[in-house]
Amino acid sequence: MAASSRAQASVQPWLYGVLLPWHRLLLSLYFRRIIIYGFEHLPINGPVILAPKHFSRWDPVVLAVLSVEPLWFMTNANQFSGVQGWVIRRLGAFPVDLARPQVSSLRYAVELLRSRQKLMLFPEGGIVRDQPLRSLKTGLAHLVQQAETRTGESIPVVPIAIHYEPTATFRAKVTIQILPPLFLADYEQSDKKATLIALTQGLEGALRSGMQQLTTATPPQD
């Protein structure tokens, strides 16, 4: 493991367990209601990649309700300065430079999956509010391919739609839909690049469908 990856791995998310009871209380006080559909699609144990829509800075905080175990987050490197950086590292976040992603960040994510952790990545690469979903690049699919090569097992990718009503503000209603997991093997093509594109398109289609259900018609059924 590279030096930067070893430094990241030395920071354990011990604050996650300490703040867990207060986290639930904070959410119940701030938001009017949080509704979750599709819990049956969420693997109990890792390795797993959770791939949510990214609408707000609240997303990681809200989505942490999906697991009592620490969730590891790949987060924009500009969020890691000062006290904020100290806190979010100990909540399970690790940095990535979105403008120039480093190999060490990818390697660290692979090592987390090898350790059977739950990893949350926002496939849009940042907060997107002006459209239902930004077109996805193949970075997440590439990570899945690398992780499966290293672990020798299939890594489920779980699309997650999230909607705030009316928006991500005080007393908003939050609806989360966990969608069926995707597997790289189901998108196998004649060459590696085509396979990564196919998985990316599958993830994008699942997220678009999930977001459409949450924002237009009747909520999904349990």
Where in this protein do the model-derived segments appear?
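Membrane-anchoring hydrophobic helices of lipid-metabolizing enzymes
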Residues: 1-49, 67, 84-85, 92
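Non-catalytic C-terminal accessory region of glycerolipid acyltransferases
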Residues: 2-11, 104-222
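Short secondary-structure boundary/capping segments
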Residues: 26, 40-41, 63-64, 85-86, ...
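A conditional alpha-helix N-cap/helix-loop micro-motif detector
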Residues: 32, 99-103
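A structural micro-motif
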Residues: 34, 69-71, 91, 117, ...
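Structural motif corresponding to alpha-helix initiation and N-cap regions
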Residues: 36, 81, 103-106
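Generic beta-structure capping elements
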Residues: 39, 53, 76, 124, ...
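Catalytic core of membrane glycerolipid acyltransferases/transacylases, capturing the structured
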Residues: 42-100
